[in-house]
Amino acid sequence: MRRLPLLEVSQLKMHFDAGKKRTVKAVDGVTFQIREGETFGLVGESGCGKSTLGRVLMRLYQPTEGSVTYRGTNLHALSEKEQFAFNRKLQMIFQDPYASLNPRMTVREIILEPMEIHNLYNTHKARLLVVDELLEAVGLHPDFGSRYPHEFSGGQRQRIGIARALSLNPEFIVADEPISALDVSVQAQVVNLLKRLQKEKGLTFLFIAHDLSMVKHISDRIGVMYLGHMMEITESGTLYREPLHPYTKALLSSIPIPDPELEDKRERILLKGELPSPVNPPSGCVFRTRCPEAMPECGESRPQLQEIEPGRFVACHLYRNAETKEKVR
């Protein structure tokens, strides 16, 4: 059974003034949906706009154009009072577990603060009990509540950040590269923790990352971003088994394979040049300057994200005949 959309993004743009009449097009016309109860993975190289997109969804930025609707409500057209109420439903886990926690507050105070701001639960004692429950839920002993952030490892700090995000009983969480600053062994622990919490609490996640090998294990569907544009969206298993967009293929070919023989035999797709500047993106398809399959028409018109089969979207002139699902070459 196909789940209903919880959050819908339509033609979203987030441009920044760079001075001297220049504009940084961090997000440039992105459209997608996140279904209730799923984890939507968002991947791409550093600088592609994925973290900016996550911050727009959290209303940390006011979009230049487009809309973000949550259960049919436009998040960027809310009054101040309505925004305050919505803050309980939408929370964020930040990338840097070292910078996102106040060093002057104890762990208990960090987790307690959102509940006090929103006046949750009847008494201070009841809130303290919830703090202990949250610490246990993320794998930390309640006694750790009296300690300060500098006393913990990176993985433990990220667990504290997760507990803080859960303190308001949210429905939707933006996890902005929550494992990128952690050791590989700790990354797996945090991913497994998020999967367990999602199952127990019915959470919906936007999981932002640049490491496709880890995104595979947590995401139901994945969107691939490049230079502010969505290149491909499909089910996680389908993306890894049969990627369509040349950029997706290149990203997947960079994931190392543990078997040395298979690693030596497989074809690697090396992208030409550097990521273009979002101040001056290429005309037509923004990926054409690095694409191994670029055609003349790629510089003439920008391919639109189109559904070439149920639940599968790609923005590439190679698949312009959506009705027959045929590749041009």
Curated annotation (Swiss-Prot):
- SMART domains, alphabetically? AAA (SM00382)
**Keywords (A to Z) from UniProt:** ATP-binding, Nucleotide-binding, Translocase, Transport
Database matches in CDD domains: ABC_NikE_OppD_transporters
An annotated Gene Ontology molecular function:
ATP binding
Record domain ABC transporter: where = 7-252
What family does the Swiss-Prot or TrEMBL record give for this protein?
A: Belongs to the ABC transporter superfamily.
Question: What is the official name of this protein in its record?
Answer: Putative oligopeptide transport ATP-binding protein YkfD
